[in-house]
Swiss-Prot record:
Matches recorded under InterPro entries: Herpes_UL95
Primary location class: host cell
This protein's name: Protein UL95 homolog
UniProt function note: Participates in the expression of late viral mRNAs in part by interacting with ORF24. Expressed before viral DNA replication, assembles at the viral pre-replication complexes (pre-RCs) and thus serves as a hub for recruiting a viral transcription complex to ORF24 to promote late viral gene expression. Also plays a regulatory role in the viral life cycle by regulating host transcriptional regulators HIF1A and EPAS1.
Keywords, comma-separated and alphabetical: Host nucleus
Residue ranges that the Swiss-Prot or TrEMBL entry lists as coiled coil: none
Family: Belongs to the herpesviridae UL95 family.
Keyword presence, Acetylation: no
GO CC terms, sorted: host cell nucleus
Pfam family, any one: Herpes_UL95
Subcellular location: Host nucleus
Disruption of the gene: reported phenotype: Deletion results in reduced immediate early and early lytic gene expression and blocked late gene expression, while viral DNA replication seems not affected.
Length: 327
């Protein structure tokens, strides 16, 4: 073997050493596992290490006919989500499911998911004066048929409370918006609430629930706390009508977008575990993402999600330069 290795390596000691080790390893394998490996020397000054990897002979149809597979116990979250989005088909039943606010997407306890905000949505979330958004919503809801069978039946005071009322601003002790802009930031609502004409029926149903959540137990004085562009008696009437609205399945935090971003940044900086929604500012918001990101596995879906951090000083500068902090 050594003479053969010297011949093949042409005197190169490194090649000779590798050749010897390779042949020795092949010999050890064939000796220790003779039923699996065999070493064969060929006439061309080389060795072949042959492994027995042939499958056992078994007729293809020797087993019993396979029964129809049962997938009823499989848990497929993405498929279930798709069925909810599509309303489980088309037609009247599908339309009812798609428009019924009780069928809004829910998340399991401990689930990590994305709260996506388009450019227009997160810009409105940072804007104090929402008169233009209020006009857009009222214009879309001017058809009385939209409010048929709904209470309250007066859209203007209801929407004014939701966007401009005294309980619709951040309650954090150290609100970043207030520190830098002089006034508490607007309470962060879900993204679709900043695009009322996208789905009017869904918008009005959620507006009822979110307003009930914010003002169902409000104890402040309306005249002193705010100056609505209409008689305050309309607000009192709306508040009294909201008592019959069930908002037990509704929750929004009493914090603004800047405070939400600060909390998300703090979790990443401390390498903590994020629970609940991950803020994702798309469009022009991507320019504020910093290099400090974190990945986390969702315990319910098994997905790995990227948690971004944002440049808060740059966002505050943008707010001031664009006048979003002007009442």
């Amino acid at each position: 073997m050594f003479a053969l290795s010297s011949l093949v390596s042409e005197g190169d000691p490194e090649v000779t050493s590798r050749y010897v080790k390779g042949v020795q390893l092949a010999l050890d394998l064939s000796e220790n596992t003779p039923g699996q490996f065999k070493l064969i020397e060929t006439p061309l000054n080389s060795f072949l290490l042959v492994s027995n990897v042939m499958p056992e002979v078994q007729p293809i149809c020797s087993g019993l006919p396979a029964l129809r597979p049962d997938f009823s116990n499989l848990h497929l979250p993405r498929l279930e989500k798709l069925q909810r989005v599509l309303g489980q088909g088309f037609g009247a039943a599908g339309e009812e499911i798609a428009l019924d606010p009780s069928h809004v997407e829910t998340h399991e306890k401990g689930q990590v998911f994305y709260n996506h905000y388009a450019t227009e949505e997160w810009t409105w979330a940072l804007t104090l004066n929402k008169d233009a958004l209020l006009r857009e919503a009222v214009d879309g809801l001017c058809d009385p048929g939209t409010w048929k069978g709904l209470l309250p039946d007066d859209p203007l005071p209801l929407l004014w409370l939701l966007f401009n009322g005294p309980a619709s601003f951040c309650r954090a002790d150290c609100c970043l918006y207030k520190q830098h802009c002089g006034y508490p930031g607007p309470v962060l609502l879900p993204g679709h609430m900043y695009a009322p004409k996208r789905d009017l029926l869904s918008f009005v149903n959620h507006a009822l629930k979110y307003t009930k959540f914010l003002y169902g137990d409000f104890s402040g004085t309306w005249a002193a706390a705010c100056r609505p562009p209409f008689a305050t008696s309309r607000i009192q009437r709306v508040v009294s009508q909201m008592k019959i609205i069930d908002a037990s399945d509704t929750y929004i935090s009493h914090t603004c977008l800047l405070c939400h971003i600060y909390q998300q940044n703090s979790i990443i900086a401390g390498q903590g575990t994020h629970v609940g929604g991950i803020l994702l500012l798309s469009g022009k918001g991507t320019q504020y993402i910093t290099g400090n990101v974190q990945t986390q596995r969702c315990p319910t879906t098994g997905d790995y999600l990227i948690i971004p951090s944002y440049d808060i000083p740059a966002i505050i500068t943008m707010i001031k330069e664009n006048g979003l902090n002007q009442l």
